[in-house]
Amino acid sequence: MTHTQQLSQAKSQSISRRRFLKTTAIAGASTFAAPAILRAKGVIEKLNIAVIGAGGRGGANLGAVAGTENIVTLCDVNEGNLGRAASNHPKARTFVDYRKVFDHANEFDAVIVSTCEHTHAFATLAALQNGKHVYCEKPLTHSIWEARVIREAAAKAKVATQMGIQIHSGSNYRRVVELIQTGAIGPVREAHVWVSRAWGWQSPDDAKKHGDIVSTQERPTDSSPIPKGLDWDLWLGPAPERPFNNVYFPGPKWYRWWEWGSGTMSDL
């Protein structure tokens, strides 16, 4: 890379970073986080966005920025998700392997990561190493080690980052934070937190009784045909190899097994 190209790249990152920081302040008006960090009003320039994970939360995040930014890249291991997203963004490049997205890193400014939990850190790390701003769905990582690696990479990249926690970016949550930070309720000495659900081992009858989505039993010993259009190997990514089973996918079932998800706390 020539000196001129380096300066041009640095200038581009600086402009985009300032815009990201500006939109962070605006994000409080949104009830749902989506990539609120990207939604700015009255800003002429548009960001070029790469979306990694286009189904589920990824589809919601894509919809949240599609009207204000340029969607230039779409990636999903499920061709069904990818096809639906691409039908609304026919000019975007499409990939099933997120690693290939960064072969064209010069084409986008920021990345939205909405893959399954066990690959969040890997896609985020690739984005940071390429100097891209990142909005990543919760949880940011799957282990303490991954979190430390991401923290170090973010410090080096000096780009804007945000982790998506949806409603926590809403105006009421931000108002409460401001009240606490200004000392309106005095020193905070204790915090009581509870959740109303837990993904323990359940029989189908127990799951039905508690209105749960799916029962959680011992890991299946058999396999199911891999759905057409799903690249199961890429879906597994860094996780141990497992035969496909319908109990894992589709839907919010996979996160009840540690190699892919983090259980109840990561789903709140």
Model regions: which residues?
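N-terminal secretory signal peptides and thylakoid transit peptides that target proteins
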Residues: L7-A27
